[in-house]
């Protein structure tokens, strides 16, 4: 999976970049044929934002977290995208189970 970590209008530490790469690595097994993962950090109106984008299997998942610091914003975005991925995984499992019986 291609991984991009970008900071717009701000500087981020190497530790935060590594954390973002770890977060993307956790999600790649959940995405069917994961192609690209991106994390974009930004600062607007005094609030830090983190946006996670995952693409794979013809589906794009996007989640944004907003908080006073980038680490917490990344955690919020991680929670949001995890919910999206869990719903997709459950739907895939539900479809195959119905036709199996």
Predicted regions and their residues:
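N-terminal, polar/charged subdomain of small-to-medium soluble alpha/beta proteins
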Residues: 1-101
């Amino acid at each position: 999976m291609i991984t991009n970590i970008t900071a717009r209008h701000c500087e981020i530490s190497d530790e935060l970049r590594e954390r973002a790469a770890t977060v993307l690595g956790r999600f790649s097994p959940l995405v069917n044929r994961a192609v690209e993962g991106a994390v974009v950090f930004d600062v607007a109106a005094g609030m830090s934002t983190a946006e996670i984008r995952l693409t794979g299997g013809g589906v794009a998942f996007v989640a944004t977290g907003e908080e006073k610091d980038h680490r917490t914003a990344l955690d919020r975005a991680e929670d949001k995208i995890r919910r999206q991925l869990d719903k997709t995984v459950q739907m895939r499992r539900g479809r195959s189970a119905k036709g199996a019986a």
